[in-house]
Design a protein with these regions (language model features):
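Carboxylate-rich helix-loop segments that flank metal/cofactor sites and access channels
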Residues: 54, 58-109, 113-115
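Amphipathic alpha-helices that form helix-helix packing interfaces
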Residues: 15, 22, 29, 52, ...
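Secondary-structure edge/capping motif, primarily at the C-terminal ends of alpha-helices
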Residues: 26-33, 60-63, 67, 95-98, ...
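Preference for long, well-ordered alpha-helical segments
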Residues: 103-156
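Alpha-helical scaffold segments that form or flank carboxylate-/histidine-based iron centers
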Residues: 7-15, 36-55, 76, 100-106, ...
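Outer-membrane beta-barrel domain signature
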Residues: 42, 50-51, 55-57, 62, ...
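Alpha-helical bundle segments that constitute or directly flank the non-heme di-iron/ferroxidase center
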Residues: 2-34, 101-126
């Protein structure tokens, strides 16, 4: 049972970091765009990801874990990719150029990385059904956010 919980906690830790990357990325993007409607959507997605973090951390605690800045070795590569896209190299360049389309493009890329992280989590054997339900719902919400960002980008 302990090994199963360790696996659950490791998956949750990876997803917490993914959601935190998304939250930070959307906050940065929202602060950089001028269009009020686009800014509002990006702020909404930042809040959504903050909610994901809370839900995932709460779930980790239910399984006896803590999500204090921990990722697995498997998750490290996905987190590095997510961090690069979600924020911190490409998004900074787009923000510096004050190019809303480029900023939204980086948000799309960050969500693609998040979707991959969630898909990876869903492929983990032996996760409890209730956790799979949470992961699937959050993944669907990320997919919907990505589609919204794509639509916003196309209207600019």
């Amino acid at each position: 049972m302990e090994n199963k919980n360790e696996k659950v906690i490791a998956v949750l830790n990876d997803l917490v970091e993914t959601a935190k990357d998304g939250q930070k990325g959307f906050e940065t993007a929202a602060g950089a765009v001028e269009n009020p409607a686009v800014k509002a959507e990006l702020q909404r997605f930042a809040q959504q990801r903050a909610g994901f973090v809370s839900e995932l951390e709460s779930t980790a605690h239910q399984y006896g874990g803590s999500t204090e800045n921990k990722t697995t070795v498997e998750g490290a590569a996905l987190q590095a990719a997510g961090a690069v896209h979600r924020g911190w190299i490409n998004l900074k360049s787009a923000v510096g150029a004050n190019d809303s389309k480029a900023i939204l493009g980086e948000c799309e890329t960050g969500d693609e990385a998040a979707i991959k992280a969630y898909d990876n989590a869903l492929q983990t054997d032996g996760l409890p059904v209730e956790l799979l339900t949470v992961i699937q719902r959050q993944r669907q919400d990320i997919q919907a956010a990505k589609q919204t960002v794509t639509s916003l980008k196309e209207t600019l």
